């Protein structure tokens, strides 16, 4: 006999979703991708499955304000708030990109109360691979 899945929403408004069960995650990995235009924070478990994510754009910042340190701090706080409620205590931080939100996101992660095992910079650096695009003339 199959187990019934609880549904939320109604058929009339067309929004039917499956309710997620909150699992306990004691340890995870926090990925911070900081570009000049936006900052994306993704929290995964140790196996790499996404638990929570947030970006400066989803936090309500639009246009050039998405690249600011304050927007990165807000995005990191939003992504981590949900996993702290699920019981995450330890995490590893992987920071990628040259953006302004790198330090602000890391500061928000440290303030959240999660113990950090290590902070690693995983920005991809070419060993003189592809030719870069030509410089902009403004």
UniProtKB/Swiss-Prot annotation:
PROSITE patterns for the chain: RIBOSOMAL_S11
Keyword Cell cycle on entry: no
Cited InterPro entries: Ribosomal_uS11 (IPR001971), Ribosomal_uS11_bac-type (IPR019981), Ribosomal_uS11_CS (IPR018102), Ribosomal_uS11_sf (IPR036967)
Gene3D superfamilies: Ribosomal protein S11
Pfam families in alphabetical order: Ribosomal_S11
Subunit structure: Part of the 30S ribosomal subunit.
Family: Belongs to the universal ribosomal protein uS11 family.
Name this protein carries in UniProt: Small ribosomal subunit protein uS11c
Name of the gene this protein is made from: rps11
């Amino acid at each position: 006999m199959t187990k019934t899945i609880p549904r939320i929403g109604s058929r009339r408004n067309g929004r039917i979703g499956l309710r997620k069960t909150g699992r306990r995650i004691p340890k995870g990995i926090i990925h911070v991708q900081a570009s000049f235009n936006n900052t994306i924070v993704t929290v995964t478990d140790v196996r790499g499955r996404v638990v929570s994510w947030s970006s400066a754009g989803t936090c309500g910042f639009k246009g050039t304000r998405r690249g600011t340190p304050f927007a990165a701090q807000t995005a990191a706080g939003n992504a981590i708030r949900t996993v702290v409620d699920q019981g995450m205590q330890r995490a590893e931080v992987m920071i990628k990109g040259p953006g302004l939100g790198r330090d602000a996101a890391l500061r928000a992660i440290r303030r959240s109360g999660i113990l950090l095992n290590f902070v690693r910079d995983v920005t991809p650096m070419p060993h003189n691979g592809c030719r870069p695009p030509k410089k902009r003339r403004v």
